[in-house]
Amino acid sequence: MKRLRGTLPSDARHAWHPEPLGPAHRDGWDTRDDDRVWDVVVIGSGASGSVAADRLVRQGLDVLMIEEGFRLSPDLGNPELDDMCRTALARDGQGGWTDEGWPWTTSNLGGGTVFYGGASWRYRPFDFDPSELVDAGGLDVRWPYGLAELAPYYDVLERRLGVCGGEEGEGSRGPAHPPTAAAEVLYEAGTALGYEPFPTPLAINRHAHGGRSACERNSLCVSHQCSTGAKGDAVAVFLAPLAAHPNFTLRTGVRALRLNQDRPDAVGSVTCLDRLGRTTHRVRARSFVVACNAIQSAALLLRSRGGRAPDGVGNHSGLVGRGLTMKLSEYVSGVVDAPSAATLADWRAHAGPFSTIAFLDHYLDADCPTGVGGMIYESKNDMPSRIRDDVLELRIETILADHPNLDNRVRLSSHADEDGVPAVVIDYTPDPRDLRRLAYMTDVCERLLRKAGATGIAHEESGFAQGSCHLHGTCRAGDDPATSVVDGWGRVHSAPNVYVVDGGFMPYPGGLNPTLTIQAHALRSAKAVAGDLVSRHTAHV
């Protein structure tokens, strides 16, 4: 169980950035703030927490953000960071358990956005109400709102992030990045099969935008941090500007241990651990925004047991942690002869972006088991040097939504992590229907590659069942408190001054990369947080 205990901060100082992000930022807790009451505490600094904090600060609210990770040294890569992070218990697919479960995207300031490829999709109308085709065994898979409600928030975020590409005429996006040499081959093969390929939407500047430079295509932004600021990660777009704002406070290396529900209908404080000083502090606020990711947020709520929340905050229905979805995915690759020496040279000289072409032609597919297929897109190998000098690698990934299931859940272990906190258990077994769908979609991928003339077709598992970068469903949204954890605004039914704004709220995971949709939900929820605070203040005047 060694991996369940992550690296202590005292042993990882080489991984931190030597400078604070701005005047509002410091590592560890400041005891001068012990008696302060904040308007809002935001727990988590990744995709959703950064968006919510940005909106709340600009509404004039006094906001504290706590993040258990740290600001990373610019040279630190994703593999090195992963080696320092605690893991989780997870099913190993063979009837046993492994301590190599993965309960993060990454754990650091900015969260997984620091190492994601920038894929920024709008969900399809079907994703908001898949009930006609998706039977989740009694779980309601309908969202409390539809695409039209989220569209204005997508618009705002696409402009802020500098999203480029996507389907023609959709959204507020800039011009697409040039296709890679591999994408050009895939485009020809796809159109020959009758497909309608289009550029992958990416939160990466093609041209200078928002005070950030244009992409230089020098990495995939997955194993290494963006060196130019072109990628629209949470630090570059939201947190760095906020760090100079007078009503924003950022504390890294501070971990939320539990929420304290000291009134029948409200949480009054969060108990935190200063991971540097190893001291605990009770931090008070009027509202709390939980943005830790679908696994970590559920674990936090489950740890938050007390007299008014005996099973954990928000767990009035017994659903906190249940309905975990992580999407199924698989990579399929092959090689083709390079069209020319110049093409091959350009392909090797420019590693990024990781994806410049996508296909939604099988997103809904009557021939696929259940009628729900998935997405296919280019997913370049992060180590192309492994490929022979005279060929192009064509590597694609298929991603599809999994069926929510009450038995797939986040639980707490009897084992403790390095902070003495119960370790996370990822209790997840793929639905046989979804495995059949995945097999169908990988066959589709093979046909596409063979149409392109590829040889040496190979399959690569993603390991989704032990943890994923796409996490959803553990704090399900709905109108009925008996069958959901939060309402359509992310507001916890039994503690309405607590809001879950990460992917945990999703009653159905959708079949696309969820980051932009999670951010749009967080922006929408922040509007409710601000409005509720004003209403409560007015009621007491």
From Swiss-Prot:
Q: Which EC numbers does the record give?
A: 1.1.3.43, 1.1.3.44
Q: Which UniProt keywords apply?
A: Antibiotic biosynthesis, FAD, Flavoprotein, Oxidoreductase
Q: Which GO terms describe its biological process?
A: neomycin biosynthetic process
Q: Which reaction does it catalyse?
A: 6'''-deamino-6'''-hydroxyneomycin C + O2 = 6'''-deamino-6'''-oxoneomycin C + H2O2; paromamine + O2 = 6'-oxoparomamine + H2O2
Top enzyme class, one word, equals oxidoreductase
Any single GO molecular-function term of the entry would be: oxidoreductase activity, acting on the CH-OH group of donors, oxygen as acceptor
Q: Which Pfam families match?
A: GMC_oxred_C, GMC_oxred_N, NAD_binding_8
Q: Segment Disordered: which positions?
A: 1-29
The task this protein performs is described as: Glucosaminyl-6'-oxidase involved in the biosynthetic pathway of neomycin by mediating FAD-dependent dehydrogenation of paromamine to 6'-dehydro-6'-oxoparomamine. Works in combination with neamine transaminase to replace the 6-hydroxy group of paromamine with an amino group. Also able to collaborate with neomycin C transaminase to replace the 6'''-hydroxy group of 6'''-hydroxyneomycin C with an amino group.
In Swiss-Prot or TrEMBL terms, this protein is called Paromamine 6'-oxidase
The protein's organism comes out as: Streptomyces fradiae
